[in-house]
Amino acid sequence: MTNEFLHFEKISRQTWQSLHRKTTPPLTEEELESIKSFNDQISLQDVTDIYLPLAHLIQIYKRTKEDLAFSKGIFLQRESKSQPFIIGVSGSVAVGKSTTSRLLQILLSRTFTDATVELVTTDGFLYPNQTLIEQGILNRKGFPESYDMEALLNFLDRIKNGQDVDIPVYSHEVYDIVPEKKQSVKAADFVIVEGINVFQNPQNDRLYITDFFDFSIYVDAGVDDIESWYLDRFLKMLSLAQNDPDSYYYRFTQMPIGEVESFAHQVWISINLTNLQNYIEPTRNRAEVILHKSKNHEIDEIYLKK
């Protein structure tokens, strides 16, 4: 165990699954298939063993937050205002953050009857490609400077205060922000914020993004495994783009497969791996829970902050 994990409790999958009574997963195999990322692997057994105990833990944190807010209201002699419970989900590109986030959205909406659950990805806070080109940092897309962190902080502040917010929409198919398109995020009981940068700090350091989170999750895996999943995802994106000239990946379908694999590997080394090692992984210990995946995508270890 490294110093990074000294303030975490390491829990095996077997022990973790015993922390919650066995119940039938509140979703079908078809629903699970529809929400998983197309290069990810997850089963109903994973839902039972990992995610139902996780949802129960979130329930504990939510109850604790509400009790504290009530007690503070008594101390301040004023009525406490209801706020959304905000969950941050971080991790590398291609590690399975989106699957985890979408699954949590379903589980929370069905665990808490009548609860509303919004899901937001920080991809929408990337600067448009044209802006990145003008700033000379298109090749740094995904790195901290390519995000409008002030806009992200403003969004979190407004959501925390119960306001509805419209935010930009990013398309992986066109590899850019979609002009004129917005996602309307309503003031909800739960808001899940997913992205590689959700534990990072803006350069001015006046506010910490993690200050807005009531619970936080980091999806982790070995670097070699993540690289394999990234390359697999890249090639699968090509298969989807074969008949779509508007797709960012279409141009790669016209290239020899060897050149494509070489290009994808270079992107991994120069961008995604560098970003992971320098900016994403160093924020891992800011999470309340770390879900570690093995080579076959199965979560084998859980780290819970003490």
From Swiss-Prot:
GO terms under cellular component: cytoplasm
Organism: Streptococcus pneumoniae (strain ATCC 700669 / Spain 23F-1)
Superkingdom per UniProt: Bacteria
Protein name according to UniProt: Pantothenate kinase
Compartment list: Cytoplasm
HAMAP family: Pantothen_kinase_1
Gene: coaA
Keywords: ATP-binding, Coenzyme A biosynthesis, Cytoplasm, Kinase, Nucleotide-binding, Transferase
UniProt record similarity statement: Belongs to the prokaryotic pantothenate kinase family.
Swiss-Prot/TrEMBL catalytic activity: (R)-pantothenate + ATP = (R)-4'-phosphopantothenate + ADP + H(+)
Top EC category: transferase
Main subcellular localisation: cytoplasm
Source taxonomy: Bacteria, Bacillati, Bacillota, Bacilli, Lactobacillales
EC number: 2.7.1.33
GO molecular function, one term: pantothenate kinase activity
